[in-house]
From Swiss-Prot:
Domain named Topo IIA-type catalytic: residues: 33-501
Species annotation: Aquifex aeolicus (strain VF5)
Assembly notes: Heterotetramer, composed of two 'GyrA' and two 'GyrB' chains. In the heterotetramer, 'GyrA' contains the active site tyrosine that forms a transient covalent intermediate with the DNA, while 'GyrB' binds cofactors and catalyzes ATP hydrolysis.
PROSITE patterns noted in UniProt: TOPO_IIA (PS52040)
GO cellular component entries: cytoplasm; DNA topoisomerase type II (double strand cut, ATP-hydrolyzing) complex
Domain notes: The C-terminal domain (CTD, residues 494-769) contains 6 tandemly repeated subdomains known as blades, each of which is composed of a 4-stranded antiparallel beta-sheet. The blades form a flat, toroidal beta-pinwheel fold, to which DNA probably binds. Unlike most CTDs, this organism is missing the canonical GyrA-box. The isolated CTD does not impart writhe, DNA wrapping necessary for supercoil introduction. The ability to supercoil DNA is recovered if the CTD is swapped with the CTD of T.maritima (residues 482-804).
Alphabetized UniProt keyword annotations: ATP-binding, Cytoplasm, DNA-binding, Isomerase, Nucleotide-binding, Topoisomerase
Protein name from the UniProt record: Type 2 topoisomerase subunit A
Chain's role: A type II topoisomerase. Despite its similarity to DNA gyrase, this enzyme is not able to supercoil DNA, and instead acts like topoisomerase IV. Relaxes both positively and negatively supercoiled DNA in an ATP-dependent fashion, decatenates interlocked circles. This the first bacteria shown to not contain DNA gyrase, although it has 2 copies of a reverse gyrase that introduces positive supercoils. Type II topoisomerases break and join 2 DNA strands simultaneously in an ATP-dependent manner.
Annotated thermal dependence: Optimum temperature is 70 degrees Celsius, active between 37 and 90 degrees Celsius.
Enzyme class: isomerase
Isomerase listed as a keyword: yes
Amino acid sequence: MENRENLVEIPIEEEVKQAYIDYAMSVIVGRAIPDVRDGLKPVQRRILYSMYEMGLLPDKPFKKSARIVGETLGKYHPHGDQAVYEALVRMAQDFTMRYPLIIGQGNFGSIDGDPAAQMRYTEAKLSPLAVEMLTDIDKDTVDFQPNFDDTLMEPEVLPSKFPNLLCNGTSGIAVGLATSIPPHNLTEVGNALVKLAQNPQISVDEIMEILKGPDFPTGGVIENFAQVKEIYKTGRGIIKVKGKAHVEKVQGGRERIVITEIPYQVNKAELIKKIADNVRNGKIKEISDIRDETDKEGIRIVVELKRDAKGEEVLKKLYKYTPLEKGFPVNLVVLIDKEPKLVDIKTLLREFIKHRLEVILRRSKYFLKKVQDRLHIVEGLLKAINFIDDIIERIRRSKDASEARNYLMEEFGLSEKQAQAVLDLRLQRLTSLEREKLLEEEKELREKIEYYKKLVASEGERIKVFIEETEELVKKYGDKRRTFIGGVKEVKEGSITVAVLQDGSIIPVEELPLEKAPVVNILRVPFTEGLFLVSNRGRVYWIAGSQALQGSKVSLKSREEKIVGAFIREKFGNRLLLATKKGYVKKIPLAEFEYKAQGMPIIKLTEGDEVVSIASSVDETHILLFTKKGRVARFSVREVPPSTPGARGVQGIKLEKNDETSGLRIWNGEPYLLVITAKGRVKKISHEEIPKTNRGVKGTEVSGTKDTLVDLIPIKEEVELLITTKNGKAFYDKINQKDIPLSTKKSIPRTRWKLEDDEIIKVVIKKSE
């Protein structure tokens, strides 16, 4: 019978799950996602390190790409040779890399999509910036790990003085994960790094006054700076990039369009083909001819127009129907401590600074030890020179080097290394001039030791070195921005009034179009900020303020889902209050929220329950939680404990049969409350009519009618309301509390707004919200 003692039985579903996780992490860490420190994937790092070991420096001759690929495969990357060669080619293409890391000789492909020549025909060597990434790698600045067969050691990461991740960007698709980081301008990145190193507390807004956005190798135009700002705060989004084109007048009164720059990663040949296809299918009828006049001076695509065709109108069509305008997806996913993370632009900069400070620390320790070792030898030599006659005499009488070395150690107190250095001393070093040189060297070594000790002991000193090195790098390699970014000045102070609809639409308005309904809220949104939208299904959606410029819409998860509230984070406080239909309330810190356009759950709802209202949370205030049947519970915000997104919340009001929560308001000491019913009736009562109690009670009846209680609004002097009805009507009303007589909770409200028989008020919005 088979021996089963050494067998371990594992359920197949567990084994499959673990195997898949292992495979996914292998792809994420070992193939697709770059390390935040040097911005390289393993194959890129191994190619560069192999070339460095081969001595392929910028001032050295080229070597065949096939030789480089073979060296990389044989030593560090035992995978397909074509995959390695493709990675090498991409690092040499100036239309792919903003700052190429490899200098190529031969055919390395083109922006038209032409493939590179076979590796046996092309040659390559490292670029100066690649050398900057590898500098100090031999000074114990980074950790090394065994290669695939444990015969060699390879670096886990490069020292990377050059901020490659941001300057060159990257893209990659892993298992269930992807990254897409655009390239940037070295001068801007370097200046932003210096600014952040000097002041770690600066905001993303302040960073982006320096680092304005992507700088693509192919140029192009990004018109909306606000959009870029929001994406760099959240780490995710799509940046619209346009090709650069202008209209020229030609003979005969005609016009033509000349395209001189195209969006990043757009195939020029495919762009021309797409334009031609649109001419053939009739979408763009005004074009008579297309020519590609691109040469070594740059891209030039000439689009000839028919007589009477307006160049600007045709250009709009080119942007609309062809890849002359393209969305670049941004997904700032990187490996931090070997774990994939979605980060903002500040985190990318901060992690690079952290890496460089670690490199400087390790390099300083390395040099400190070297200098201390040298000082030890120099001290021994100086001691020996003072007694050189006795030493020479004794060495002559010694049987061998070992006896002479032992004599020096015992007689003069030298260490073994010092004694050996004395034995290795050449006779010419015994002159008085050489002694002076040793004394001078000793002085210099002691000064260096003090310097390196200061670097090791003080992070502030290391930051100074980092700033100096970064400024030197920018001075040496920095260049002008290629991609134009528009709207930088206007965005800083700009804002827009938007109406948030129940279906998730964001409509920009100067005054709300009354035919647009049902409206959830009207807000003045700064371009540099954004909106959180909360749905009845307990999800919160994020939308950038810049996206509201042309109108936008969040993608809700189902037809039953609708938006019930919206707010601007910067004007809302630190915590959000939610009220559910079944009488529950929940307080959740805004720090728990993620900037996700696809939404994230923020409350656990039971079957049949849903979120009906939201409000800002301030501990010193009271919650007014009211039901459709007109009951109100008033209790302190402090009675609702803060909880995580996965929690249900706590009971706020005890509901009677067939009753449900209508909404909640925050009472902040206002003397009066407006009671508003579905049939357009309003009354004013004193806040004292609703005594403060604990949460979880039945509450006080305040409506004085069987009509549904729609809202309960605290008022001090005056309030402006936007009223929307179930039939889609909307109107404004400004109410001064002096115009409404004081009533009691049992009084019947008076009709203020005359509605149709089948019409009821659905939403009441305080305009200040």
